[in-house]
């Protein structure tokens, strides 16, 4: 096993599925990372391994964080990509959850480590969660689209296939690495309203969790997420109502959503490229920011 993979224990797993989510460009409104974090909590997941961040991050961009423990001791936290294992209720299989951060460098090596561990654990399906900005209203359920390494997977899991072409993130690179290794892989994408892109989107997280549960054939109690969705919707609605132009725009999106149902228009390659440029510019500004303390 590669040195970059730090494995504390090897769990005994039953027909495991790997579920991944990465903070960063593939995590609009933090929908994917919120979903994965909720699943880890709901399923009682336990950490068993991680990836050494040393070779995969520019620490001037993805800086480590210092925090105080009991008001005295300083704790240093590095960018983390951690693997957790959990039993999935109601079905005879287990889950491996990878909660991480999109790396800055060496994406092919990074994804090869994930594939290597997947093969070692005899994982037979990889499901990557993502969330993207789209022309959807905050008052309706987040539509979910998907892609897969094989046409049979799209048909088997009833995915609404994506025809997107353009820039990609670590989810797309992992998807390709799985295909090259002969590992079945599916990606699920929830739509996040672009006009509230900076706010965490529990609605997107809920849609991803529900779609994943349906794909796996299990039931998921999501009362906590549903309550967060209600609060999110109320707060955004109040903010939107303060601007008549935005209110009118949202009403147009609502009308279109009601007509189209669960489908939505995936942004074009040019739109995604513009979003990538904006994201990278914001990351650069964050990396160049002055620290508040030593």
Question: Where does each model-flagged region fall?
Answer:
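Catalytic cores of processing enzymes, dominated by hydrolases/peptidases
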Residues: 135-215, 219
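N-terminal short beta-loop-beta anion/metal-coordinating cradle
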Residues: 1-100
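Hydrophobic/aromatic beta-strand patches that form the interior of the parallel beta-sheet core
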Residues: 49, 96-98, 127, 184-189
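Conserved active-site and cofactor/substrate-binding residues in soluble primary-metabolism enzymes
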Residues: 30-34, 105, 109, 165, ...
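A conserved C-terminal secondary-structure "cap"
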Residues: 196-294
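Flexible, glycine/proline-enriched loop segments at strand-loop-helix junctions
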Residues: 22-26, 98-107, 157-165, 195-199
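Internal, conserved structured core segments that host functional sites
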Residues: 93, 101-152, 174
């Amino acid at each position: 096993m590669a040195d970059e993979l730090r494995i504390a224990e090897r769990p005994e797993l039953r027909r495991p599925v790997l579920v991944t989510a990465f903070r960063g460009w593939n995590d609009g409104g933090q929908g994917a990372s919120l979903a994965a974090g909720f699943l880890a909590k709901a399923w009682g997941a336990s950490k068993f391994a991680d990836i050494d961040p040393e070779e995969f991050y520019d620490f001037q961009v993805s800086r480590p964080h210092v925090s105080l423990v009991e008001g005295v001791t300083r704790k240093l936290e590095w960018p983390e990509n951690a693997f957790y294992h959990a039993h999935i209720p109601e079905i005879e299989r287990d889950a491996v959850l990878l909660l991480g951060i999109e790396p800055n460098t060496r994406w092919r090596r990074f994804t090869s480590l994930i594939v290597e561990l997947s093969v070692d654990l005899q994982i037979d399906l990889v499901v990557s969660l993502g969330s993207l900005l789209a022309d959807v209203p905050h008052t309706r359920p987040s539509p979910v689209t998907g892609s897969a390494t094989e046409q049979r997977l799209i048909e088997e899991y009833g995915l609404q296939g994506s025809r997107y072409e353009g820039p990609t993130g670590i989810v797309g690179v992992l998807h390709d690495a799985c295909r090259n290794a002969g590992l079945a892989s599916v990606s699920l994408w929830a739509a996040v309203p672009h006009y509230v892109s900076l706010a965490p989107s529990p609605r997107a997280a809920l849609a991803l969790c529900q779609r994943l549960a349906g794909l796996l054939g299990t039931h998921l109690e999501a009362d906590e997420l549903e309550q967060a969705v209600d609060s999110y919707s109320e707060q955004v609605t109040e903010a939107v109502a303060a601007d008549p132009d935005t209110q009118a725009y949202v009403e147009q999106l609502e009308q279109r959503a009601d007509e189209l149902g669960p489908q939505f228009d995936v942004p074009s390659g040019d739109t995604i490229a513009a979003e990538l440029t904006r994201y990278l510019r914001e990351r650069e500004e964050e990396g160049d920011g002055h620290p508040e303390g030593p």
